[in-house]
């Protein structure tokens, strides 16, 4: 982070501002700090200090290199919570994740999906609720698919069933 950037910025602000990270939503600090949400994440207490620190200073030696992974794993948990689903719902309605490239889906909004819940297996894809297919996103993103997981679209549409679209032409 350059010295010209806002000194009140956190690692999270910096990370969410990186081109290609627009699929991610902001995980609230109280959710990140809740020890229940940290269960099973190794070294999280050390990385938590870096993630929540008001100013990024890579020269301080406080960056561990795993911040992206740990934020991504907390993000995957958060988007399954009520607050997380609401945040992702807003992004879905705005079309932040893109639209289905299948012409018969009539530019149906898509959701991010990971092909695996295991970190490092694949990058994020987009899932069309109409044709039920996964595609490479048009946006320039290299986010790990584990930040969303393979079950996110199913959870999203089971909690918000009125958003699913039939395969017929919506213009008729």
From Swiss-Prot:
Superkingdom, taxonomy of origin: Eukaryota
Gene Ontology MF terms: protein kinase regulator activity
GO CC annotation terms, alphabetical: cytoplasm; nucleus; protein kinase CK2 complex
Tissue spec: Probably not expressed in wild-type flies. In males lacking the Y chromosome, it is testis-specific and constitutes the main component of star-shaped crystals.
Gene3D superfamilies registered for this protein in UniProt: 2.20.25.20, protein kinase ck2 holoenzyme, chain C, domain 1
Cross-referenced Pfam families: CK_II_beta
InterPro entries registered for this protein in UniProt: Casein_kin_II_reg-sub_N, Casein_kinase_II_beta-like, Casein_kinase_II_reg-sub
Induction (UniProt): In wild-type flies, it is strongly down-regulated by double-stranded RNA (dsRNA) interference mediated by Su(Ste) transcripts. In males lacking the Y chromosome, the absence of Su(Ste) locus, relieves such down-regulation, explaining why it is strongly expressed.
Subunit structure, interactors included: Interacts in vitro with the casein kinase 2 alpha subunit (CkII-alpha). The relevance of such interaction is however unclear in vivo.
Other facts noted in the record for this chain: There are multiple copies of the stellate gene in fruit fly, encoding proteins that are extremely similar, which makes their individual characterization difficult. Thus, most experiments probably do not discriminate between the different members.
Family statement drawn from the similarity comment of this UniProt entry: Belongs to the casein kinase 2 subunit beta family.
Role this protein plays: Unknown. In males lacking the Y chromosome, its strong overexpression leads to the appearance of proteinaceous star-shaped crystals in the primary spermatocytes causing meiotic drive, possibly by interfering with normal casein kinase 2 activity.
Protein name in the entry: Stellate protein CG33243
Organism this protein belongs to: Drosophila melanogaster (Fruit fly)
């Amino acid at each position: 982070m350059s010295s010209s950037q806002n000194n009140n910025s956190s690692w999270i602000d910096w990370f969410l501002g990186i081109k290609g990270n627009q699929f991610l939503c902001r995980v609230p600090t109280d959710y990140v700090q809740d020890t229940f949400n940290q269960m099973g994440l190794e070294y999280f207490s050390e990385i938590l200090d870096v993630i929540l620190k008001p100013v990024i200073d890579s020269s301080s030696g406080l960056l561990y290199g795993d911040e992206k992974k740990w934020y991504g794993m907390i993000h995957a948990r958060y988007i399954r919570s009520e607050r997380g689903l609401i945040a992702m719902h807003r992004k879905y309605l705005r079309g932040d994740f893109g639209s289905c490239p299948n012409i018969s889906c009539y530019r149906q909004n898509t959701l991010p999906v990971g092909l695996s819940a295991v970190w490092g297996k694949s990058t994020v894809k987009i899932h069309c609720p109409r044709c039920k297919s996964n595609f490479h996103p048009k946006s320039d993103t290299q986010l790990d698919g584990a930040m969303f997981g393979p079950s996110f679209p199913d959870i999203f549409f089971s909690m918000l069933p009125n958003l699913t679209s039939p395969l017929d032409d919506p213009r008729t």
